[in-house]
């Protein structure tokens, strides 16, 4: 593990391999350790970098006055790419990491040459359809609100359980995980608390359609076959708005598709990365 200094913090990252750079960006309950099935595979042909976003382990979880901001995470990604001298890079984002990656491509053009987005939870896009609005209301009621309340009360396990079950789409999913997996998720409880107490405009802003449409880099959109319908609805809107997309369904996988079916996931991404 190495750390890199940014404008007001240091971020931990790991690096392996040589060649064209690939940057992996993890989701809400994650860290740079989320991609073991990808780092070894892609480092055979690429320079692979996986980093822990601000507030996520092993980085400090919280500092007084900090806010969980999409803009800050996107700026961190751009600054990291610049500091490592790897612009323009291919960025592979899982869940909220995909939201961060797309925001970086929009607000920091020239840093990213290709995007792989695995179900970015761009919740404002759900408001564009009646079905999406219903899905958003259910997710807020069944996952976000109870997780927020539990974390505010200091019950990290209940908060993480409610959130994880919500993004998995099945109650009881968290409790079925092996103990080491549950412990790893609980390490990010502080980051989840910070995210859910942030203002919506900070951590979940609505990106204007014209800004999404102006993203000219090629984008691979991925969905898990077993993921909640909500994520497919969001990807439908991204497919409609982005000018250069390729969409694939990962069989037998849920929201954490890179972990559930790494062989298929890696093959699809490898094909996307292949020269034309």
Predicted features and spans:
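Conserved HGGG/HGGXW glycine-rich cap/lid loop of the alpha/beta-hydrolase fold
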Residues: 5-66, 80
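Short beta-to-alpha linker loops that shape the active-site pocket of alpha/beta-hydrolase fold enzymes
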Residues: 52-56, 121, 253-254
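Conserved acidic catalytic loop of the alpha/beta-hydrolase fold
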Residues: 71-89
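Conserved hydrolase catalytic core segment
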Residues: 87-126, 130
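A catalytic-pocket lid/entrance helix-loop region that shapes and gates access to the active site
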Residues: 118-152
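Conserved alpha/beta-hydrolase catalytic His-Asp/Glu region
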Residues: 152-193
